From Swiss-Prot:
It comes from Acetivibrio thermocellus (strain ATCC 27405 / DSM 1237 / JCM 9322 / NBRC 103400 / NCIMB 10682 / NRRL B-4536 / VPI 7372). It catalyses: Endohydrolysis of (1->4)-beta-D-glucosidic linkages in cellulose, lichenin and cereal beta-D-glucans. Gene3D superfamilies: 1.50.10.10, Dockerin domain (1.10.1330.10), Endoglucanase-like (2.60.40.710). This is Endoglucanase F. The gene is celF. Residues 1-27 form the signal peptide.
């Protein structure tokens, strides 16, 4: 009691520092509905494991499908942490707790904006993973992936090759911080799932209780070692124990959990050199004390907790005890150079939640609400540029994110810019003078992370509650794929009776990135001149001494009546993938030789010789077609021959309710039946694939299916969308279904 009285006396004597005004003022009229929608979508780009068929983008694919195998478990799923591919459960669980807290506070906003199914789906993606990580009451796997190994490679998640060990804590080697945070995440999530899926909510709550007991019993982080240097627990574990017990109280109504939360008060961090509860940092992945104080104030109404959280929010707004967080010249509340915006926007969420509570003084509520809006608007672009990828004016284009960059050579410099739009990602933000450069290699100001977006989503939901906004109907992040597979070639040497060709098979796939061990190419020749000289096919030989592991054939018939043959360059069994300078392409040198003699051999009439130059510089050529299995993915072929039946290697979805059949008068690809095949057809097919287009007329549905099955495999899914896009871009001349 003496401690509390001394605390209140100190509070009565504090000095107040005025909040600075921004030097530059821009319009702050933003579409909070769209921003909320996109900030939620960010988590779909972070997904690890086997992705659902109804995913809302076309550049993420299945990845890390063997996670946990080193310990005989299935630890697939969850989110990659940031721009890397380690699954750090401490910040992941924090992000889940924050997202669930936002739904707890603003469920109506999510319903009204149409975003409730999406945020619940994203939360569940992580909580399903946490369930896998908790195979028994006192065992918890807190990390998958080795930070050093992961950070030493720069490439997309879908083609990772490095070992991904999994790490656990148990009674012998405990980790109270990460276990308690996961308990909080599971408890908070159980609350928001209870109205729609009470059985799943009960499962989450059971895990939350077991995890909390495990964390509270051990009270040690001795076994939490693999994340050191990345996500070390600087604040200790008592803030997480407090946080978790509060969420368990809210989930169960069990007074013992609330009593437990309050019992940790002697262990709460104090402001340096004082007996005051800490107020001068931020609610974040490491420190949950401030959110705990806010919830305790609302739950108990006790003046002690109320004063503690107000000290903290005052420090971030008008100042407290003679000090205040730094502000940039343009008005950003600036705590730290590493991810400055995640702190400011998370504080905006806390300020909004507290200001909306009836127990908050109206004058303070007005200050906190103004602060929250200014910080959110700063992130959205009030100073002239957005800090949210894919939103607003001049948004970041090159966040520090391996999969969004999608390098095929494992080099941060190649390509020059990110190939993908990481929609909704909040970047780290500017420095203390508002300076910011959109640089891929800047992991302090331009990286993104699960914890960055977590409080930001909550703040946006609060802005949507107050100011509204319109989410984009049926929004998806489908991109037009760029060139992924192709062949480069050059003439190494040539003479009267031979030609030596260097050909490079290249995989720069990114929609999504994927390896293939079924790539092959065809080099076409016309031997008419040799035949005219009486030379037979068996007198023409093909040799290859440097082939990168490929099987190089002798001449095979394509159109023998017209003397057209080809060399088959087959890399079957060799995985060519966009993951390094020696992995994304394979070179092959081969020589075609005819009996020596004037006029016995003429390269100029060969289909695949067109456009090739002699020398060391290879050039892209569409006259050497490339195949993935039986599907031609690049280039042209000469007339007269026939290609094998296409067998797409892309995983296909379920059979539609209407079986594709040939319908008279229907043109393949013309899914809107206007007699043309263009981007309008692509958009309509995309709506169908993501299940935002439905048919009430069975006959019209049958016509649509007949036109949409462009790959001819009897199913309508993203494969058809991919093939149709290639046709529209003139990368293929015929649909596989026509071949």
């Amino acid at each position: 009691m003496k401690k509390i009285l001394a605390f209140l006396l100190t509070v009565a004597l504090v000095a107040v520092v005025a909040i600075p005004q921004a030097v530059v003022s821009f319009a702050a009229d933003f579409n909070y509905g769209e921003a909320l929608q996109k900030a939620i979508m960010f988590y779909e780009f972070q997904r690890s494991g086997k992705l659902p068929e109804n995913k809302r983008n076309n550049w993420r694919g299945d990845s890390a499908l063997n996670d946990g195998a080193d310990n005989g478990l299935d630890l697939t799923g969850g989110w990659y942490d940031a721009g890397d591919h380690v699954k750090f459960n401490l910040p992941m669980a924090y992000a889940v707790t924050m997202l669930a807290w936002s739904v707890y506070e603003s469920r109506d906003a999510y319903v009204q904006s149409g975003q409730l199914p999406y945020i619940l789906d994203n939360i569940k993606w992580a909580t399903d993973y946490f369930i896998k990580c908790h195979p028994s009451p006192n065992v918890y796997y807190y990390q998958v992936g080795d930070g050093a190994l992961d950070h030493s490679w720069w490439g997309p998640a879908e083609v990772m090759q490095m070992p991904r060990p999994s790490f656990k804590v148990d009674l012998t080697n405990p980790g109270s911080t990460v276990v308690a945070e996961t308990a909080a995440a599971m408890a908070a999530s159980s609350i928001v799932f209870k109205p729609t899926d009470p059985e799943y909510a009960a499962t989450l709550l059971r895990h939350a209780k077991e995890l909390f007991t495990f964390a509270d019993t051990t009270r040690s982080d001795a076994g939490y070692r693999a994340a050191e240097g990345y996500y070390s627990s600087h604040s200790g574990f008592y803030d997480e124990l407090t946080w978790a017990s509060i969420w368990l109280y809210l989930a169960t109504g069990d007074q013992s959990y609330l009593d437990k939360a309050e019992s940790y008060e002697p262990h709460w961090e104090r402001e340096r050199g004082t007996t005051l509860i800490s107020y001068s940092w931020a609610h974040c992945w490491d420190n949950k004390l401030y959110g705990s104080l806010l919830l305790l104030a609302k739950i108990t109404g006790k003046s002690y907790y109320k004063q503690c959280i107000e000290n903290h929010l005052d420090y971030w707004t008008v100042g407290f005890n003679g000090s205040r967080v730094q502000y940039t010249p343009k008005g950003l509340a600036y705590l730290d150079r590493w991810g400055s915006l995640r702190y400011a926007t998370t504080q905006a969420f806390l300020a909004s939640v507290y200001a909306d509570w009836s127990g908050c003084d109206p004058a303070k509520a007005a200050v906190y609400k103004e602060f929250a809006k200014k910080q959110v608007d700063y992130a959205l672009g009030s100073t002239g540029r957005s800090f949210v990828v894919g939103f607003g004016k001049n948004p970041p284009r090159n966040p520090h994110h391996r999969t969004a960059h999608s390098s095929w050579s494992a080099l941060m410099t190649e390509p020059a810019e990110c190939r993908h739009i990481l929609v909704g990602a909040l970047v780290g933000g500017p420095d203390g003078s508002d300076s910011y450069v959109d640089r891929l290699d800047d992991y302090q100001c331009n990286e993104v992370a699960n914890d960055y977006n977590a409080g930001f989503v909550g703040a946006l939901a609060k802005m949507y509650e107050k100011y509204g906004g319109e989410p984009i109907p049926n929004f998806v992040a489908f991109e037009t794929p760029g060139e992924e597979f192709y062949v480069e070639a050059a003439v190494n040497a040539a003479g009267p009776g031979f030609v030596n060709i260097k050909a490079s098979i290249i995989n720069k796939s990114g929609w999504p990135a994927r390896g293939s061990d079924k790539l092959s190419a065809k080099y076409f020749v016309d031997i008419s001149e040799a035949v005219a000289k009486g030379i037979t096919l068996d007198q023409i030989t093909v040799q290859s001494t440097t082939n990168g592991g490929a099987k190089v054939s002798q001449l095979l018939p394509w159109d023998p009546d017209n003397h057209i043959y080809y060399v088959n360059i087959d890399f079957t069994g060799i995985n060519i993938f966009p993951g390094g300078i020696n992995e994304y392409k394979r070179d092959v040198y081969f020589t075609i030789t005819a009996p020596y003699g004037e006029g016995n051999w003429d390269n100029t009439n060969d289909f695949s010789f067109q456009g090739l130059e002699q020398g060391f510089t290879s050039k892209k050529t569409e006259y050497i077609p490339l195949y993935d299995g039986n599907v031609r993915v690049w280039g042209k072929v000469p007339d007269g021959g026939s290609e094998p039946d296409p067998t797409p290697t892309i995983t296909v979805g379920p059979t539609p309710s209407v079986t594709p059949t040939s319908v008279p008068g229907i043109m393949l690809g013309d899914v809107n039946f206007d007699g043309r095949i263009n981007s309008t057809d692509y958009s309509r097919l995309k709506r169908y694939v993501i299940k935002s287009l439905e048919f009430t007329d069975p006959e019209e549905h049958q016509k649509f299916i007949a036109a949409a099955d462009v790959d001819g495999n009897g199913r309508i899914n993203s494969t058809d969308l991919y093939v149709l896009n290639r046709y529209i871009l003139k990368l293929i001349e015929k649909f596989p279904a026509e071949q």
